[in-house]
């Protein structure tokens, strides 16, 4: 699928979206750094508040990333729905994969949960 701003990032393999070329060691290191920061923030704020902040930050960065691919706001606006669909599809795939991992490994992942 072409990124609405012009870059090709997502590729369709069967019925599964993936970004294989981006899922390298550095990818997971960056993700872990964001998770570590979120975990630190839960010392001062609720998990729900931290999650909302992370979602907002991700959405804001996605909007910025998208804007970089357009010449003006009108061109960006013309691709608004396509852009939303693109990012929602990616988030959905990642969320479903992580939910499935937690379902399969619930006891191992949550054995230290206090509440």
For each predicted feature, which ranges?
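Solvent-exposed interaction surfaces and binding hotspots enriched for charged
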Residues: 19-115
